[in-house]
Regions:
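Short, Lys/Arg-rich flexible segments
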Residues: 1-70, 76-148
Length: 148
């Protein structure tokens, strides 16, 4: 007599538990991060956060803020025109840069308006993880327990 045991593959187990990149646990975590990250992002009018919400696809394990100014805010450094050594200039239409200019990073830190988000600053992903990592891990644990 012969006995055969067929075990699922690691990938099948991961998918069954919702832990694959498009699984429900990952989607829950992405949604949770998106909700929580707001307080660490620069927030004056809310435009950057609203764009982030609109551009982030919850089924993907990433938060997206794809705007021309996002990297400046995210990294928290002043970028300048290599020719003028200025970040930009004011016009009647608002703040502008030379057309086609590729800016270079400086060592100067940006100054964030913290009137609405006191925790706003650079690398909001790291700030969120440092401040709320254990709480987010507990959220995932609760979610996984309730989905059994």
């Amino acid at each position: 007599m012969e006995a055969r045991i067929i075990l699922p593959t690691a990938a099948q187990l991961i998918r069954k538990k919702g832990l694959d990149p498009h699984g429900d646990v990952q989607m829950f975590h992405t949604q949770n991060v998106l909700r929580r990250i707001k307080k660490y992002m620069p927030f004056v009018s809310g435009a950057t956060y609203k764009i982030t919400v609109a551009q982030t696809v919850i089924s993907r394990p990433e938060i997206v803020t794809d705007t021309p100014y996002a990297k400046y805010l995210f990294y928290g450094k002043v970028w300048v025109d290599p020719k003028t050594h200025a970040a930009g200039f004011m016009t009647p239409e608002g703040w502008r840069s030379r057309k086609g200019c590729t800016k270079i990073i400086t060592a100067r830190n940006l100054t964030y308006n913290r009137s609405k988000n006191p925790a706003a600053g650079p690398r909001w992903d790291r700030a969120l993880s440092a401040a709320e990592g254990p709480a987010m891990a507990a959220d995932i644990e609760r979610y996984m327990k309730q989905r059994r």
